[in-house]
C-alpha cells in the first residue's frame, strides 16, 4: 500500500500589470524576456505557481515560477513571451 503524501497539487496564478512589473531578464530571445527574476511580495506564492503579466487584455508573459529564494522568484516563458527584455 503506498504511503500517503502531504503535497499540495493546486497552483495559483499571480497576475501583474505589465506597467507595474519590475524584473530582471535573465535570458532573452529575439528581444523578449524568456526567463525573469522578480521580487515576490506575496508570501503565499510558491514554486509551481504561474506568473501572468498582462498589458490590457494582452498576455505578455505566461510561465511557471520554478524557484523562489531570498524573496526573489524566477519564472520561465520560453515559447510565447512578449515581454520586452529591457531593464525594469
Positions of predicted regions on the chain:
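Short, basic/aromatic beta-hairpin or loop at an interaction surface
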Residues: 16-33
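A short macromolecule-binding patch
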Residues: 83-88
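Short, charged beta-turn/beta-strand-edge "cap" motif at the junction between a beta-strand
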Residues: 56-60
Amino acid at each position: 500500500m503506498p504511503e500517503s503524501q502531504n503535497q499540495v497539487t493546486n497552483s495559483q496564478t499571480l497576475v501583474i500589470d505589465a506597467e507595474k512589473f519590475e524584473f530582471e531578464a535573465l535570458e532573452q530571445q529575439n528581444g523578449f524576456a524568456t526567463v525573469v527574476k522578480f521580487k515576490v511580495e506575496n508570501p503565499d506564492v510558491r514554486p509551481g505557481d504561474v506568473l501572468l503579466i498582462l498589458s490590457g487584455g494582452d498576455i505578455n508573459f505566461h510561465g511557471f515560477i520554478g524557484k523562489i529564494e531570498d524573496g526573489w522568484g524566477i519564472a520561465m516563458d520560453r515559447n510565447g513571451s512578449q515581454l520586452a527584455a529591457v531593464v525594469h
